[in-house]
Amino acid sequence: MAQDQGEKENPMRELRIRKLCLNICVGESGDRLTRAAKVLEQLTGQTPVFSKARYTVRSFGIRRNEKIAVHCTVRGAKAEEILEKGLKVREYELRKNNFSDTGNFGFGIQEHIDLGIKYDPSIGIYGLDFYVVLGRPGFSIADKKRRTGCIGAKHRISKEEAMRWFQQKHDGIILPGN
């Protein structure tokens, strides 16, 4: 009887943003990297973390363990707010290739000033990468240290589900691949 009056969605199957990872890779340590860190701090209000190079690449002038990038992880309402700004820059258009098989997606923007940050000549202009990790209630059992659980096959997020969520939640447009 209850199903005839309007099928209710299972609240445990609802997709939501687990985290938003923002990354600026400068490719060198020094002043440009610290200015990129200031950009991320202005955007998120959090202290960003520096990433080191894994290998020495002589052609790029990068040494192993040299700080070359800066990233920040944002969760909750702040993540949704920043994602909305980033999608507005991209005009809510993503390619099919932007979505991974595990239901996550990422994209990049050319200039951080498009997000509403005031241009500062002493900092310059940086591009940044957005990476969104989607999840459902119950996904945290896979992250526990003690008595780690597995996420069942039916509860995992597919590429198609992530694309459908993007289209419904953000009225997004998905363009064909390459």
From Swiss-Prot:
<dbReference type="GO" id="GO:0098556">
    <property type="term" value="C:cytoplasmic side of rough endoplasmic reticulum membrane"/>
</dbReference>
<dbReference type="GO" id="GO:0005737">
    <property type="term" value="C:cytoplasm"/>
</dbReference>
<keyword id="KW-0007">Acetylation</keyword>
<keyword id="KW-0699">rRNA-binding</keyword>
<dbReference type="InterPro" id="IPR031310">
    <property type="entry name" value="Ribosomal_uL5_N"/>
</dbReference>
<dbReference type="GO" id="GO:0015934">
    <property type="term" value="C:large ribosomal subunit"/>
</dbReference>
<dbReference type="Pfam" id="PF00673">
    <property type="entry name" value="Ribosomal_L5_C"/>
</dbReference>
<feature type="modified residue" description="Phosphothreonine">
    <location>
        <position position="47"/>
    </location>
</feature>
<dbReference type="InterPro" id="IPR020929">
    <property type="entry name" value="Ribosomal_uL5_CS"/>
</dbReference>
<dbReference type="InterPro" id="IPR031309">
    <property type="entry name" value="Ribosomal_uL5_C"/>
</dbReference>
<keyword id="KW-0539">Nucleus</keyword>
<keyword id="KW-0963">Cytoplasm</keyword>
<dbReference type="GO" id="GO:0005730">
    <property type="term" value="C:nucleolus"/>
</dbReference>
<dbReference type="InterPro" id="IPR002132">
    <property type="entry name" value="Ribosomal_uL5"/>
</dbReference>
<comment type="subunit">
    <text>Component of the large ribosomal subunit (LSU). Part of the 5S RNP complex, which is a LSU subcomplex composed of the 5S RNA, RPL5 and RPL11. Component of a hexameric 5S RNP precursor complex, composed of 5S RNA, RRS1, RPF2/BXDC1, RPL5, RPL11 and HEATR3; this complex acts as a precursor for ribosome assembly. Interacts with PML. Interacts with MDM2 (via its RanBP2-type zinc finger domain); negatively regulates MDM2-mediated TP53 ubiquitination and degradation. Interacts with NOP53; retains RPL11 into the nucleolus.</text>
</comment>
<keyword id="KW-1017">Isopeptide bond</keyword>
<feature type="modified residue" description="N6-acetyllysine; alternate">
    <location>
        <position position="52"/>
    </location>
</feature>
<feature type="modified residue" description="Phosphothreonine">
    <location>
        <position position="44"/>
    </location>
</feature>
<dbReference type="GO" id="GO:0006412">
    <property type="term" value="P:translation"/>
</dbReference>
<dbReference type="Pfam" id="PF00281">
    <property type="entry name" value="Ribosomal_L5"/>
</dbReference>
<comment type="similarity">
    <text>Belongs to the universal ribosomal protein uL5 family.</text>
</comment>
<dbReference type="GO" id="GO:0032435">
    <property type="term" value="P:negative regulation of proteasomal ubiquitin-dependent protein catabolic process"/>
</dbReference>
<dbReference type="GO" id="GO:0005654">
    <property type="term" value="C:nucleoplasm"/>
</dbReference>
<feature type="cross-link" description="Glycyl lysine isopeptide (Lys-Gly) (interchain with G-Cter in SUMO2); alternate">
    <location>
        <position position="52"/>
    </location>
</feature>
<feature type="modified residue" description="N-acetylalanine">
    <location>
        <position position="2"/>
    </location>
</feature>
<comment type="function">
    <text>Component of the ribosome, a large ribonucleoprotein complex responsible for the synthesis of proteins in the cell. The small ribosomal subunit (SSU) binds messenger RNAs (mRNAs) and translates the encoded message by selecting cognate aminoacyl-transfer RNA (tRNA) molecules. The large subunit (LSU) contains the ribosomal catalytic site termed the peptidyl transferase center (PTC), which catalyzes the formation of peptide bonds, thereby polymerizing the amino acids delivered by tRNAs into a polypeptide chain.</text>
</comment>
<dbReference type="GO" id="GO:0003723">
    <property type="term" value="F:RNA binding"/>
</dbReference>
<feature type="cross-link" description="Glycyl lysine isopeptide (Lys-Gly) (interchain with G-Cter in SUMO2)">
    <location>
        <position position="38"/>
    </location>
</feature>
<keyword id="KW-0687">Ribonucleoprotein</keyword>
<feature type="cross-link" description="Glycyl lysine isopeptide (Lys-Gly) (interchain with G-Cter in SUMO2)">
    <location>
        <position position="154"/>
    </location>
</feature>
<dbReference type="GO" id="GO:0034504">
    <property type="term" value="P:protein localization to nucleus"/>
</dbReference>
<dbReference type="GO" id="GO:0022625">
    <property type="term" value="C:cytosolic large ribosomal subunit"/>
</dbReference>
<keyword id="KW-0832">Ubl conjugation</keyword>
<dbReference type="GO" id="GO:0003735">
    <property type="term" value="F:structural constituent of ribosome"/>
</dbReference>
<dbReference type="GO" id="GO:1901798">
    <property type="term" value="P:positive regulation of signal transduction by p53 class mediator"/>
</dbReference>
<protein>
    <recommendedName>
        <fullName>Large ribosomal subunit protein uL5</fullName>
    </recommendedName>
</protein>
<dbReference type="GO" id="GO:0019843">
    <property type="term" value="F:rRNA binding"/>
</dbReference>
<feature type="modified residue" description="N6-acetyllysine">
    <location>
        <position position="85"/>
    </location>
</feature>
<keyword id="KW-0694">RNA-binding</keyword>
<keyword id="KW-0597">Phosphoprotein</keyword>
<dbReference type="InterPro" id="IPR022803">
    <property type="entry name" value="Ribosomal_uL5_dom_sf"/>
</dbReference>
<keyword id="KW-0689">Ribosomal protein</keyword>
